[in-house]
Amino acid sequence: MNQKQQKPTLSGQRFKTRKRDEKERFDPTQFQDCIIQGLTETGTDLEAVAKFLDASGAKLDYRRYAETLFDILVAGGMLAPGGTLADDMTRTDVCVFAAQEDLETMQAFAQVFNKLIRRYKYLEKGFEDEVKKLLLFLKGFSESERNKLAMLTGILLANGTLNASILNSLYNENLVKEGVSAAFAVKLFKSWINEKDINAVAVSLRKVNMDNRLMELFPANKQSVEHFSKYFTEAGLKELSEYVRNQQTIGARKELQKELQEQMSRGDPFKDIILYVKEEMKKNNISEQTVIAIIWSSVMSTVEWNKKEELVAEQAIKHLKQYSPLLAAFTTQGQSELTLLLKIQEYCYDNIHFMKAFQKIVVLFYKAEVLSEEPILKWYKDAHLAKGKSVFLEQMKKFVEWLKNAEEESESEAEEGD
């Protein structure tokens, strides 16, 4: 029987750390002193600052002391809770807060942060946490310091260094109550929109579900589109005011459609539904054209349609006849009638079983006084969509001829009467 071979042991062995993995071990104060000394030596040349930070990452433990590093770059030294600089600490003037308060200077500082975070990717999370903390400390900073931080944050949001989720800190109750959040947001959005445009800002906000929360920058008693619009328009941010107004309208439309469908499924009386819709139109400044499109969509979604083409037309006529009084209440303008016609055309084209039902629906609505002859003739002549155009125009040909003849007859009767 073979004896088991003795395995070699590792006791007494020493492994050398590769030189590039060695980091000098400091406490936060020593780390701060090293960074501040280096920044003082580079002076205000931000290119030299970026090079110094790049090289220092090989020797200093950025991962451990990320918060200290960013405190120094923004405020000039380590921040105490609340945002004040500790009196007994060393500080530097090579930082955001000591720089000039203008967009060009903040763009140059943004480049320093970009280069640093691109070089040391692991600092990304630490930097986001730092900005969230700084936003909570806003009351501890001077107005000028807030302005610089706002401009810098806007630029970093625009170039993707920061994620828009950091804006959550601005919804802090005390900051909102004292008007700090709204004032900060003005400077931030100005620099963000200056770098990109309102569409890019909207995309970033939507990604983090913040596109409908901007009114929360104000206390509850001031959270209205009117107040938001006035405040930001006067501050020179009309495009942001319009964006929020549009968001509010989109939200109101969705809410209107949802409530309409619930009312219809409950079988609420039309007079109650009409009253509710008119109130919503007034409250949210929604046009009749928008409303008729919502009602059409809601009416068509309340029923399970037959899959057989020969049966669906009859089912549609029966269903729509029932809802004609509701539709008629919101086609008081020619433009609303035309909108409805286009929605019917679109629906019949998108749902192939309805292709042959188009003309029957239009005739029903004409008889029920939902649609009148002028918008129908306009639709036929030049206001129709390209979708299924040849099929629908052919279907409507005889009815349109009848309408034209009826119109001519009524005109000649009027002339005879004169």
Swiss-Prot record:
Entry's Gene Ontology cellular component terms: cytoplasm
Superkingdom of origin organism: Eukaryota
Biased composition, class Polar residues, residue ranges: 1-14
Xref: SUPFAM superfamilies: ARM repeat (SSF48371)
Region of interest (Disordered), ranges: 1-25
Keyword terms of this UniProt record: Activator, Transcription, Transcription regulation, Translation regulation
Span of domain W2: 246-413
GO terms (BP aspect): regulation of translational initiation
Annotated function: Translation initiation regulator which may repress repeat-associated non-AUG (RAN) initiated translation probably by acting as a competitive inhibitor of eukaryotic translation initiation factor 5 (EIF5) function. Enhances histone H4 gene transcription but does not seem to bind DNA directly.
Family: Belongs to the BZW family.
PANTHER family named among the record's database cross-references: BASIC LEUCINE ZIPPER AND W2 DOMAIN-CONTAINING PROTEIN (PTHR14208), EIF5-MIMIC PROTEIN 2 (PTHR14208:SF0)
Protein name: eIF5-mimic protein 2
Organism: Gallus gallus (Chicken)
Underlying gene: BZW1
